[in-house]
């Protein structure tokens, strides 16, 4: 793969001699070994809703009040894909992109991406109930994928984002620190896309992970219904905000009306 938007770079299998020659090339800024990134989220019960985020007070009022619907905004879900036929999406799922070589395209055979999309923009479970949802599939049915595949997804987002159109990208995934992945996210931000990324589920410093350590991304940690940091959530100076992330009810993929509860 060759990157031309998120990075000026490429993916290649190199011999030791080829690697040495590239390391000595003054035009090469950095070389990284491709690594594995994984989903941020585990299935838990019971669920709780949107009630917490529309008020500062921890005491919930059994209502989710909002002034904006996200209409006219593109939300790129960089994840496992989205089930476009789910009723909660109301036909607002675009064709998107896949970096995964399987028969699902930008559809979802894992469920995490659809759950995230439902949390972002589902009509019942979502925050922005009229946003346009665009699947960017970079993780497999097993919930993992190469860092280079994630960068390919970001590269596609940058290439297809229309200048002046409000857009956000969600990345509920992560791996070890990658300068290349962080640089790709930064390039996307510079292009006008707001990147919201998971702090991670390792109960460690978020600065030790990517894309959580990207300086200008909005890095989000997880809290439970008691407003305390979730036991699994990463923490530290790289975390910009905490939000509900324990036992979240959203879209499932077993049918066009199914639900699923996940944490992360």
Language-model features, listed with the residues they occupy:
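Short gly/ser/thr-rich secondary-structure transition/capping motifs
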Residues: 52-63, 202-204, 223, 256-257
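Catalytic-core segments of hydrolase enzymes
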Residues: 116, 162-255
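Extracytoplasmic/secreted envelope proteins and their assembly/folding machinery
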Residues: 16-19, 25-28, 50, 113-120, ...
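Short, well-structured alpha-helical segments in soluble
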Residues: 153-163
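Autoinhibitory propeptides
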Residues: 1-49
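Active-site glycine-centered loops adjacent to acidic/histidine catalytic or metal-binding residues
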Residues: 79, 200, 264
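Subtilisin-like serine protease catalytic core
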Residues: 63-95, 103-149, 163-168, 190, ...
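A short glycine-threonine-serine/GTX helix/turn-capping micro-motif
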Residues: 257-264
């Amino acid at each position: 793969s060759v990157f031309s938007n998120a990075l000026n770079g490429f993916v290649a299998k190199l011999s030791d001699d080829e690697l040495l020659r590239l390391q000595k090339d003054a035009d090469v800024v950095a070389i990284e070994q491709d690594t594995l990134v994984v989903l941020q989220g585990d299935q838990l019960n019971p669920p709780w809703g949107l009630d917490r985020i529309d008020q500062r007070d921890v005491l919930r009022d059994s209502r989710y009040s909002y002034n904006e619907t996200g209409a006219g905004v593109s939300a790129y879900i960089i994840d496992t894909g989205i089930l476009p036929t789910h009723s909660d999406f109301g036909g607002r799922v675009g064709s998107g992109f896949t970096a995964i070589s399987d028969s699902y395209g930008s559809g979802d055979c894992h469920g995490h991406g659809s759950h995230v999309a439902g949390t972002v923009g589902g009509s019942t479970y979502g925050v922005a109930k009229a946003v346009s949802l665009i699947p960017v599939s970079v993780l497999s049915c097993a919930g993992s994928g190469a860092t280079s595949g994630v960068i390919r997804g970001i590269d596609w987002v940058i290439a297809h984002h229309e200048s002046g159109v409000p857009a956000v990208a969600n990345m509920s995934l992560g791996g070890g620190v990658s300068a290349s992945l962080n640089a790709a996210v930064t390039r996307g931000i510079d292009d006008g896309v707001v990147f919201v990324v998971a702090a991670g589920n390792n109960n460690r410093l978020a600065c030790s992970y990517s894309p959580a350590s990207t300086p200008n991304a909005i890095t989000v940690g997880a809290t439970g219904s008691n407003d305390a940091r979730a036991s699994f959530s990463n923490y530290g100076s790289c975390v910009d905000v905490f939000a509900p992330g324990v036992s979240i009810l959203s879209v499932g993929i077993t049918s066009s009306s199914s639900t699923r509860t996940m944490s992360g």
